[in-house]
Amino acid sequence: MPNCFKFHTVIERHWQKPYPVLSFLLKPLSGLFAKIAAKRRTDFLSGKRQSEKLPVPVVVVGNIHAGGTGKTPIVAALVSGLQEKGVKVGIISRGYGRKSKAVHVLNAESRAEDAGDEPLLLFRKTGAPTAVGSSRAEAGRALLAAHPDIGLIVADDGLQHYALRRDVEIAVFPSADTGRTDLDLLPNGSLREPLLRLDSVDAVVVSGGKADALFRPSENMFHSRIEAGRIYRLNNPSEILDTGRLKNQTVVAVAGIAKPARFFDSLRNMGITVKRTVALPDHADISAADLPDADAVIITEKDAVKFSDGICTDNVWVLPVCAIIEPDLAAFVLERLEDVPKAV
């Protein structure tokens, strides 16, 4: 695992600031990847490969990057916005990182190994019925069977899952990449699909800041920013941390997410002096035994769902975050769906 993590770290650095030698080696592979990805999409759109339509509208929220765009908080915000407008929303996802391959409809006893960390986090944050499966259509059928009153499904990270038909496509794109001219497809770059793909989606959500002035992939462009909530104790979420008491304590921050620097920066921006940071691979397994010794250990919400109740020590705290999307993305989705007939 450590060697794989180091190699992946090198590749990610290359994606952000390309190394000429690596680009020379990887560029031909990116060309091959582009042809395969284009053919796959064309086959589904032309009907050469079959896709399935669910009996309720499907809104796909995904990205053309290989992770790290800040999508999960945006999905949570969209689902919450739809719920506030009276819509019974369900969520489907692949459930990356879980131990089982079977379709799983989440319940109060579900764990990260059953559902994956991100779907479990979405389920707990929104309360929306949620199902996971490698086949999104199969997950959708199972979800509707368990919750027949669902009126709309949000598919988390399914933009390239063309086996499931969709009524609205939303792509999340990081603001840091909106002005770049050196983006490339995998493996030379971080893109799953070319930038032109953004011209065919219904909306683009620029995450983490404002877009470059020349970035106009869609007439329907939204912006999102992350707001940190109040840090709470993992063993007792109703207990809020008084950050002033950390002044003379040893604080360690631990994150198993795609862009851990964002999390560490958020803590520092809150005035917390972090003595040590621990960056783990995205979706990494983590338990109480893996946590460093410190007066206070602060972790992400995504990592927090991996802990079973009652097995963690009292020095572990969680920083919750939420996405603020402007203008109103949920209202846009409902307006878009007014002209979409219900599947039969």
Swiss-Prot record:
Q: Which family does it belong to?
A: Belongs to the LpxK family.
Pathway recorded for this protein: Glycolipid biosynthesis; lipid IV(A) biosynthesis; lipid IV(A) from (3R)-3-hydroxytetradecanoyl-[acyl-carrier-protein] and UDP-N-acetyl-alpha-D-glucosamine: step 6/6
Keywords in UniProt for this one? ATP-binding, Kinase, Lipid A biosynthesis, Lipid biosynthesis, Lipid metabolism, Nucleotide-binding, Transferase
Q: What is the lineage of its organism?
A: Bacteria, Pseudomonadati, Pseudomonadota, Betaproteobacteria, Neisseriales
Q: Which InterPro entries match?
A: LpxK, P-loop_NTPase
A GO CC annotation recorded here is: plasma membrane
Q: What does this protein do?
A: Transfers the gamma-phosphate of ATP to the 4'-position of a tetraacyldisaccharide 1-phosphate intermediate (termed DS-1-P) to form tetraacyldisaccharide 1,4'-bis-phosphate (lipid IVA).
Per the UniProt record, the source organism is Neisseria meningitidis serogroup C / serotype 2a (strain ATCC 700532 / DSM 15464 / FAM18)
Source gene? lpxK
Give this protein's Gene Ontology molecular function annotations. ATP binding; tetraacyldisaccharide 4'-kinase activity
State the EC number(s): 2.7.1.130
Keyword ATP-binding in annotation: yes
Pfam families assigned to the protein according to its UniProt record, in alphabetical order: LpxK
At the top level, the lineage of the source is Bacteria
Q: Give the binding site residues for ATP.
A: 65-72
Reactions this protein catalyses: a lipid A disaccharide + ATP = a lipid IVA + ADP + H(+)
Q: In the UniProt record, does the keyword Lipid metabolism occur?
A: yes
Name of this protein: Tetraacyldisaccharide 4'-kinase
| GO annotation, biological process | lipid A biosynthetic process; lipopolysaccharide core region biosynthetic process
Do you know which NCBIfam families this protein is assigned to? Answer: lpxK
